[in-house]
């Protein structure tokens, strides 16, 4: 093909593509205008009733603001209430009891490494420095109960540092936050869908257009109401892992073939709206898949507790050739990508532990093993031979792999993959044995709105804070945190909004 004909071909292709695009253009939703009259006025509006939103509401109210929390779903809590109930707290009593040396510097470094250094170092530092005080806040102010004997190690962390709520669920925190809101007189309004965020002609966020009586997922349901915010709006609307079309826009491989750990309301409407009003967004294509998910369960389930707290910490993960293929305590992206690679070869990933690992999990979450084994979420075997046969794993290869793991347990040095071998890891020499398939599910949106350290949302055109708009939790990018991120920055966002001066 000559240069001229190639140029003509490309021009024709571009024109043709433009014609096709113009034929299917749908106008973007217009920005909502400031109403002539507001239906209701409060000081601070919080959007979302998970860890971050409720923490924000509590702090804003304590600072003297009149606060309302808006939740689009019929029940409060979002993903937080079905969360696994673990959070990181460097220097907590559980670490001290187990003789684990840790520091703020090490936690900050681990977060930066797990985030591939795409995180904002200043925000990471704030998170690390305030992790312990926020753990103490949940205990002393909210009355959250934790298992004081157990400590766990999350993937990507160089030492064990996460603690467990006593009930083994994020509800152990959310319920206490809801109780505190009620005590403080904060209304948590359910079925309240935020349709538009309203900026005035000076660029300030002054309120919201809301549909009360909303019936998910019917966008035109409910009655429209305009609520003004004298001081500020705090956005804590979470991620979009349950929104297949929106997540595929950012990561095309995440089709409807992938399940999600999230509740159905984890959708992208407010992600689109914040684009529409000019909020800067970062790293939205960084969508985390939970590598420890059990395909036998819908949603988050409980199978992940075995895969992580028993097999990854005290056992091993192998493919169906009987070979280890990843550091079981690497960060979630590394492990998920490794499983995807095995699955692409027609293999499956199997998490294995013996009774010792199961006992460790049981100590952290009393009663959990019965809940796992009786419905066959996790399978139990008297012999290694029976396990290998059930998963079609070559027995000799599995025994060889176990011998390597047992050598690492003795030397405290995992030469093949560099897994952290804690002092309580023991060689796996006796049964009974437990095993389960693990396959990633869409779990967490690492990107989101760009904010400053004080949680003010930044404008995409000016890079400056949008007056009256704050955000925390999963809808914020550049931190790569988790539960503790929601608590630390949720509280800060509520305080920032309550103290905002017009």
Which sequence ranges carry the predicted segments?
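Glycine-rich loop(s) and the adjacent beta-strand/alpha-helix scaffold that form part
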Residues: 215-297, 492
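An anion/pyrophosphate-binding glycine-rich loop and adjacent beta-alpha core
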Residues: 271-273, 280-393
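A conserved FAD-binding loop/helix module that cradles the flavin
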Residues: 255-262, 269, 476-500
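Conserved N-terminal/central alpha/beta ligand/cofactor-binding core
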Residues: 12-14, 72-187, 191-193, 204, ...
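Short beta-strand "acidic-cap" motif of Rossmann-like dinucleotide-binding folds
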Residues: 66-71
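Beta1/beta-strand and adjacent pyrophosphate-binding region of the FAD-binding site
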Residues: 38-50
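A glycine-rich dinucleotide-binding beta-alpha-beta segment and adjacent secondary-structure elements
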Residues: 397-477
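N-terminal secretory signal peptides and thylakoid transit peptides that target proteins
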Residues: 1-17
